[in-house]
């Protein structure tokens, strides 16, 4: 079920938005279920701010990230974390190293005798039919939602091995050093590593003592890393925990994005036409029931809260 708000300015939208958040909280409390409010990606709906109401359950389709020391909470599509710097080292000259048969980060880490945090991971994507080179520290994973938002594309997928090969890159030893003809997206984690090991774009070889941005630069440097359990909270430095959950509500500050495309406006007191400022609010009626069953059942079966029970 969806609802919308229409206001004359951003301040009015914030009031409407906050009222709906409070209304949702009270609704779920009356339903007898416990929810967590998390920062969320706006997705295809768009807008500049959105929050999800998540019912925590191991069977949930979403992953959320919570801090164990403060109130930070976010869907993993949106979650951020504080990057931990590798110990400071003086930058050394790059060297080619023979690495026969080494194709993965774990294999490279074992072969070189270094942690994955001392490597550079190269990942290739097709973004609206353009091959994108992504470079991130080897101990981290790419958050594809963040990457898609950074690129502002409608279609994003992993490039196939054939596409990587056709682009002139060596799978398992692709290098951001000296690469040409691609947009290179770098995660800021590379600035927190020193003398890293990266591909050499030559079969059976890698480069050691690679430093960013000394040895290569990026077209875009932006957070594209997936926040995971054990990472540091971006607010307080506490430890992040991950949980599965079901989304049962989602609220958005749409702003004027839809009123501009629909040419929806109003006349103010001075007779000046201005864009309507919109909000959007979704609630999953069926998901509330499913969530209650997941959260409240015991060994004897379903334990419905009285307010949503089909019978006494």
Language-model segments: which ranges?
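Extended, low-hydrophobicity, polar/charged segments
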Residues: 1-288, 295, 299-306
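Short, intrinsically disordered, charge-balanced linker/junction segments flanking boundaries
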Residues: 307-312
């Amino acid at each position: 079920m969806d609802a919308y708000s229409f206001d004359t300015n951003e301040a009015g939208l914030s009031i409407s938005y906050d009222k709906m958040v409070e209304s949702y909280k009270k609704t779920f409390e009356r339903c007898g279920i416990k929810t967590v409010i998390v920062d969320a990606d706006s997705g295809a709906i768009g807008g500049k701010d959105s929050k999800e109401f998540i019912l925590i359950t191991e069977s949930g389709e979403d992953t959320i990230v919570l801090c164990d020391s403060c109130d930070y909470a976010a869907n993993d599509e949106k979650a951020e974390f504080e990057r931990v710097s590798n110990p400071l080292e003086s930058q050394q000259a790059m060297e080619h190293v023979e690495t026969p048969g080494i194709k993965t980060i774990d294999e490279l880490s074992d072969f070189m005798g270094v942690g994955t945090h001392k490597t550079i991971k190269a990942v290739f994507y097709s973004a609206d039919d353009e091959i994108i080179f992504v470079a991130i520290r080897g101990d981290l994973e790419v958050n594809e939602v963040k990457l898609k938002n950074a690129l502002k594309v409608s279609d994003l997928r992993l490039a196939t091995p054939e596409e990587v090969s056709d682009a002139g890159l060596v799978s398992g030893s692709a290098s951001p050093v000296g690469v040409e003809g691609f947009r290179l997206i770098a995660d800021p984690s590379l600035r927190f590593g020193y003398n890293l090991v990266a591909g050499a774009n030559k079969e059976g070889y890698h480069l050691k003592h690679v430093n960013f941005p000394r040895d290569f630069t990026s077209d875009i440097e932006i957070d594209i890393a997936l926040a995971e359990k054990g990472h540091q909270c971006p607010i307080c430095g506490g430890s992040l925990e991950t949980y599965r959950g079901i989304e049962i509500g989602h609220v958005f500050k749409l702003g004027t994005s839809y009123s501009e495309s629909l040419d929806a406006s109003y006349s103010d007191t001075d007779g000046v036409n201005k864009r309507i400022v919109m909000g959007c609010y979704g609630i999953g009626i069926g998901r509330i029931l499913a969530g209650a069953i997941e959260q409240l059942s015991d060994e004897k079966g379903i334990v419905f809260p009285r307010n949503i029970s089909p019978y006494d």
